[in-house]
Every structure is written in C-alpha cells, then in structure tokens.
C-alpha cells in the first residue's frame, strides 16, 4: 500500500505563492516591531518536559507534544503505563508557546542582556489540538515581550507597538479587549471560591463562549455549589454590557458592571493605562471585558486579547506574568508580553500576489549553452531583479500563463544570440 503523501493532520505545506505572501506579512511585522525597539531572538523548538509541565501553561500543557527518552525498554513502558506516569518516559517536549522558552532564555542569559530587555520572537509552536478551521497543530506566533520593567510603561509599549503593527498590516476594526487577573481573582473571592479553586475556575470561565454560563456553573459546582451559582449570576449579568466588545476603559464604566465590593486598585490602574495610551491608530480600539481570562496559568496582572469581526477566535493576546522568570532565578523579575496569532491574521489581510515589479522570466531555447544562459540570468540578478528560468515549449501560452500566475511581471525570449544587455523585456500583463 502506498504511503500517505499529505502532511500530518493539523499541519500544512505552503506552495511558493502562499509562502511568499506569508513572508511578506512576516516582513511587515518584523519591521514594525523592530522600529519599536524589540530585538529578535531564537530558542530551540524543544524544552525540558518538566519545564513545559510546571503548571503554568494551563490547558495547553495537556496539548503538549512530548519526546520519548532514548533507550527505553519494554519494561520501562509497562511500568509507566501501570503507574499512570507516562510523562516520566519523556525528557523533552515541543514548545506550545514562546513565553516559557523566553523565561528560560532570559534566566540563562541575564548577565548578557540589558536590565530591561525587549524581545521579539517569530517562530512555530506545536499543540495537539483537534484540527479545524483556523486551528492547527503547528502554527506561527509573533511575540514581543518586555522583561525587567515593572511599571505600566511595559503594557503601554506593547499595546502601542502591536496596534501600530496591525495598522501596518492593514488590519482594521480590531478591538483590544483588556482585563486584569487581579480583578478576576477578586470576583472569584466575592463569589465565595476558596483560593485553591481559582485556577480551575479561571479555566472554566475561559471557556465561557463555548459552554455558556450554565456550563461554567456545571463544571465548578462540585464542592462549591453556592460559589458556582453566584459566579453564574455574575457572568449572566455581564452579557448586556458586552455587545460592543466590552465597555470603555474608565473606572466609572468598569465599576458600573462589576459587583459591589470588588477590589478597585487594579481598576484605577487600567484607567491610568488607557490615559497613557492616548489615541491608537484608526481601526484599533480599547475595551474592558470582565470575562476575558487568557488560559495560561502564568498571568499575574493586566491581560489583553485582540478581537476581529472576521475571526471566530482571538487573533492575538498577552499580559503580565511577573512570577514566571523568578522560578528560574529565585528572585522576582517583572515581565509582560503580547503575541499576534499569525495564522489567523494572515487570513484577514490583503497581501500582494506578485513577485514584484522587478521580476522577470527568461524563456530560453533548450539548445542554448548553459553558461550563456546563466551569464544573462546573473547579470539581471546582480541588477536587483528576481529571475526565473523557464524552458521554451510548444505550448508557449502555458509557459507564460504559469509565470503570470506566479506573480512575475515581465518576460524575455533568450537564445545563443541574445545580447547580455538591452534584453527585449515584455510585460506579462499584456498577454
């Protein structure tokens, strides 16, 4: 039987035209974030499995791809299965985000980095998702992080840089939804949840759009029925205020929708942040969304997420995670990050289809000496043109149509008598 020739489920091949479109978008993102002072780094695709399963990744830890240790025996496998500790069979795992690797990177290289480090990472990550439209097992994230800055300057810089990047990509009608983990914790305390139950409650609230308030209550009722019922009432009370993506980022608007008695310190900080940001690019707006959670367990303060009407899910998000890096260093290090979900963004924006105005196809005579053909091609490439060779065939129209479909703008026929200069370039658009 023939071997499968399709990619693994949830993973994709990209043909040249699509790859070029993606690289164009990535170039826009790189240039924009670089202009805001972020330095690009690279980390391995795999990390120690214990680090990836340290309880900070939320539900994503359950989706991590793990790598078996070398040299395992059948007895090792049976013992692990019988004990239920199959993770002990693994020593590495593929990264499921870029934040956990960044924390390890900063802890490892702290002495070589500036006290406030602005990081840019653009790289694939892997999660064992159930593949569906817009959700893949391998996908690219574009992360910016500021490590070492405790003030709201970090959040303000991240939101400003991300808003400018969305604008540079031409993505309009974006809403940056904002919340704070401290407000969420205060809500859970107000409803009567013991602190030990907060992480589980946050995971359930994060699924609110999928399972509804009744589903959240059902998940949390065991051992905390009264608290779960109170939370269900609070969540239901939010709905009339969220039709526009949330409420204005002002203390007055936020307090109007929260239950009385919720700690207000974080609310004042959100209003201060909104004032600091000032006017964002046209097509990007800020809103407070009290049910925004962000599923990762490492967030400690302000959290944010990008919503767009053309996407059924968020197209980016992030927040403050002051406690993570301290796990590696034994001392607290403030950190905050923002990630653009590239796969969802690239489907929403208009990108150029062509190879560029300086792209040319040389349709060559098969009898032409190779050295002569390469000399002509090299001269054009040295002059800054993108050059492709295509053999002249009986069906010349098919050759030229293929070149036009690939985005090439012009062509020339070449043979042994063609001069190296003054090629007769013809526009493909006139065919």
UniProtKB/Swiss-Prot annotation:
It is found in: Cytoplasm. Its main location: cytoplasm. GO terms for biological process: histidyl-tRNA aminoacylation. The keyword Repressor does not apply. Its EC number is 6.1.1.21. Gene3D superfamilies: Bira Bifunctional Protein, Domain 2. This is Histidine--tRNA ligase.
């Amino acid at each position: 039987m023939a071997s499968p020739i399709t990619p693994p489920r949830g993973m994709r091949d990209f043909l040249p035209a699509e790859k070029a479109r993606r690289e164009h978008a990535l170039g826009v993102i790189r240039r924009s974030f670089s202009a805001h002072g972020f330095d690009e780094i690279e980390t391995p695709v795999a990390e120690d499995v214990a680090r990836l399963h340290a309880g900070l990744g939320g539900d994503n830890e359950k989706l991590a791809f793990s790598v078996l240790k070398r040299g395992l025996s059948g007895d090792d496998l049976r013992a692990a299965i019988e004990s239920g500790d199959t993770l002990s069979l693994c020593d590495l795992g593929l990264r499921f985000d870029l934040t956990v690797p960044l924390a390890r990177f900063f802890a490892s290289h702290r002495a070589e980095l500036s006290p406030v480090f602005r990081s840019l990472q653009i790289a694939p990550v892997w999660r064992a998702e159930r593949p569906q439209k817009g959700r893949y097992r391998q996908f690219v994230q574009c992360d910016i992080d500021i490590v070492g800055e405790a003030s709201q300057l970090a959040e303000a810089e991240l939101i400003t840089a991300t808003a400018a990047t969305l604008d540079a990509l031409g993505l309009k009608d974006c809403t940056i939804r904002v919340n704070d983990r401290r407000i969420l914790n205060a809500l859970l305390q107000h409803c009567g949840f013991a602190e030990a139950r907060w992480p589980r409650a946050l995971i359930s609230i994060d699924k609110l759009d999928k399972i509804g308030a009744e589903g959240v209550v059902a998940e949390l009722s065991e051992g905390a029925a009264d608290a779960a019922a109170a939370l269900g009432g609070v969540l239901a009370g939010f709905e009339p205020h969220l039709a526009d993506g949330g409420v204005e980022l002002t203390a007055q608007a936020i307090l109007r929708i929260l239950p009385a008695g919720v700690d207000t310190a974080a609310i004042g900080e959100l209003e201060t942040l909104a004032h600091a940001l000032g006017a964002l690019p046209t097509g990007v707006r800020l809103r407070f969304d009290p049910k925004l959670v962000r599923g990762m367990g490492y967030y400690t303060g302000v959290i944010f997420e990008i919503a767009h009407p053309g996407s059924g899910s968020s197209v980016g998000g992030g927040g403050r995670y002051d406690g993570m890096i301290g796990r590696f260093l034994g001392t607290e290090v403030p950190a905050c990050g923002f990630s653009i979900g590239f796969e969802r963004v690239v489907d929403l924006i208009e990108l150029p289809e062509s190879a560029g105005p300086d792209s040319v196809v040389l349709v060559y005579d098969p009898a032409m000496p190779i050295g002569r053909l390469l000399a002509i091609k090299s001269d054009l490439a040295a002059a800054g043109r993108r050059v492709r060779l295509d053999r002249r065939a009986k069906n010349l129209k098919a050759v030229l149509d293929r070149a036009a479909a690939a985005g090439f703008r012009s062509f020339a026929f070449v043979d042994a008598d063609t001069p190296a200069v003054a090629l007769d370039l013809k526009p493909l658009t006139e065919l």
